[in-house]
Amino acid sequence: MAPNIRKSHPLLKMINNSLIDLPAPSNISAWWNFGSLLAMCLATQILTGLLLAMHYTADTTLAFSSVAHTCRNVQYGWLIRNLHANGASFFFICIFLHIGRGLYYGSYLYKETWNTGVILLLTLMATAFVGYVLPWGQMSFGGATVITNLFSAIPYIGQALVEWAWGGFSVDNPTLTRFFALHFLLPFVIAGITIIHLIFLHESGSNNPLGISSNSDKIPFHPYYSLKDILGLTLMLTPLLTLALFSPNLLGDPENFTPANPLVTPPHIKPEWYFLFAYAILRSIPNKLGGVLALAASVLILLLIPFLHKSKQRTMTFRPLSQTLFWLLVANLLVLTWVGSQPVEHPFIIIGQMASFSYFTILLILFPMTSTLENKMFNH
């Protein structure tokens, strides 16, 4: 038999073992599509981002007009920008669903894969934040000032740290320049960590909805899951294109159509929708350092999830009590997202505080307790 280059060539062999002949569980559902969708999001964002960077000027006097110029005068510049801005939203939708899938089906028990995933989430959040500053609109400036200022809550070194990050005594030209450098660099860092994420995943193989070993029943990735991934891609690209073409500014803030002015503060500084849940947790603590710690904890708590798994079963498929708790957590996050978009006044303050408290309570206390209870129930 003639040697197959796909299986013998050093580079093609790696691609083959990762994307073609990879043995995959036969029963993984559409919830397992989001990994490949995230890869597609990253590819799209890097491509559109490169095209935008070719027309962008990282200078406080020119940034806003260079973005306007891209939209007005560059061939399809408006489309590239709208795809890039809304592509970020879809990136976050996919990553939230991907994390939710991991929580529900106990995928976090692959600790290395889970931890690299959390690092990817943090890097993505950093990338989105520095990217939002680049158009240099009012909300870009306000957001940059507020969020970088949070570092000043760190005892002793805080103030020095903030001024070091700013490159001066306020958010100014050096800040914009370094944010552009970071926004250009970080997506490639994400691509690198993604490869590590995949290496760890392929050490164990995929989990499945039943949470049991699938070694006895594997199917090749191609054509089954390659085709399924293409279907997932079309189902994601359709709403993305619809949003970018019909309502490109739906998720944006009108304040960002005004060029940045350090002398005027927007009435309500709020981040993009995908940060609102964390922003609500930050605001619900009436102390700067406490708020910053809660903000960090809201995402870093994911690192604790594997250690809080007390159930004898891996997935929640056959655990109705944990399922109820899971959907309560989802509803709780939606409430936090909504509260984060509202002004700081009654009743939103108390709603935010209650939602923040219940967020941590569900994850740290109720999940382990419920799992232990279910274990006892299964024994009878």
Curated annotation (Swiss-Prot):
SUPFAM superfamilies: a domain/subunit of cytochrome bc1 complex (Ubiquinol-cytochrome c reductase), Transmembrane di-heme cytochromes. It is found in: Mitochondrion inner membrane. It is a multi-pass membrane protein. Binds 2 heme b groups non-covalently. Its cofactor is heme b. InterPro entries: Cyt_b/b6_C, Cyt_b/b6_C_sf, Cyt_b/b6_N, Cytb/b6-like_sf, Cytochrome_b, Cytochrome_b_C_euk/bac, Cytochrome_b_N_euk/bac, Di-haem_cyt_TM. The keyword Ion transport does not apply. This is Cytochrome b.
